[in-house]
Amino acid sequence: MRNSVQSDLKYINIINISETLYLFYSTGLDTLEYIDSTYKNFIIMYVNQHLLYGTTLKYLSVGEFFINSLTIFINGIRETMTSSTVIMYAIFGMFIFSEIMVFSTFIWGFFHFRLSNPVMIIEVNLEAFLQISDVLNAGSILISLILQRIEERGYFEVDYMLERLILIGFIFLSFQGDEYSLVKSYINNHWVTLYFNVLTGLHSLHVYVGGIFALMQAFASENCGCQKDEDFNAGMYWHFVEIIWIALTMLLFLL
């Protein structure tokens, strides 16, 4: 086994040296420096530390090698495309992705417990549910109009719509607070009330954050003019909140 490992390592070293010499003589010193900083150093680390190549896990080690090479390639492309706009979209995208993961965790927990208890009677206040949904739907329609005005460069109406969006957000939070005050059970009475309060509480928190975003954009629109990218990001955040509410509606009120 040890002799097989050593022979494989020597074979990898021979390939590495041959490729390095060929690129050195054909392209010059810059290519050699690039190889020394990326590919060659990784090969040396792989040979010295990753001895799985000579065992039954040979293909696993080779797969890991190609995954690391692909990662280096992707990072090289990402570094060439780095700009302030790309960084902003990356941060905003990762924030949305993290929020999706948080909600998915609690939604899956509720879905799991609900399927484990198929026979269960839950009293649903449809009037309060419809009021909250109508308010949030009005906010979603208003966001769509804001994004349309931004695309049409109708910036004079954006400030007015953002102020109305802030008002809609506070109305939604008021209705949600009334619903909490009328609930007759506490958060630790049953798993249904636990998930109901946690999920709707997280959603209300995101509506509050969306209202802060709208307030900041309204202030910036009054002082600095309309900022297309920032308004678009705030609008997409509100659409994300609307999608989450649709998922909560199916789980908490219709399932």
Curated annotation (Swiss-Prot):
Membrane topology: Multi-pass membrane protein
Top-level taxon: Eukaryota
Compartment annotation: Mitochondrion inner membrane
Keywords: Membrane, Mitochondrion, Mitochondrion inner membrane, Translocase, Transmembrane, Transmembrane helix
Gene Ontology terms: biological process: mitochondrial electron transport, cytochrome c to oxygen
The enzyme's E.C. designation: 7.1.1.9
Reaction(s) the record says it catalyses: 4 Fe(II)-[cytochrome c] + O2 + 8 H(+)(in) = 4 Fe(III)-[cytochrome c] + 2 H2O + 4 H(+)(out)
TM region(s), chain numbering: 12-29, 57-77, 91-111, 126-146, 155-175, 196-216, 235-255
Cross-referenced PROSITE patterns: COX3 (PS50253)
GO cellular component assignments: mitochondrial inner membrane
UniProt-recorded Gene Ontology molecular function terms: cytochrome-c oxidase activity
PANTHER family (UniProt xref): CYTOCHROME C OXIDASE SUBUNIT 3, CYTOCHROME C OXIDASE SUBUNIT III
Subunit structure: Component of the cytochrome c oxidase (complex IV, CIV), a multisubunit enzyme composed of a catalytic core of 3 subunits and several supernumerary subunits. The complex exists as a monomer or a dimer and forms supercomplexes (SCs) in the inner mitochondrial membrane with ubiquinol-cytochrome c oxidoreductase (cytochrome b-c1 complex, complex III, CIII).
Physiological role: Component of the cytochrome c oxidase, the last enzyme in the mitochondrial electron transport chain which drives oxidative phosphorylation. The respiratory chain contains 3 multisubunit complexes succinate dehydrogenase (complex II, CII), ubiquinol-cytochrome c oxidoreductase (cytochrome b-c1 complex, complex III, CIII) and cytochrome c oxidase (complex IV, CIV), that cooperate to transfer electrons derived from NADH and succinate to molecular oxygen, creating an electrochemical gradient over the inner membrane that drives transmembrane transport and the ATP synthase.
Entry similarity comment: Belongs to the cytochrome c oxidase subunit 3 family.
Entry protein name: Cytochrome c oxidase subunit 3
Gene: MT-CO3
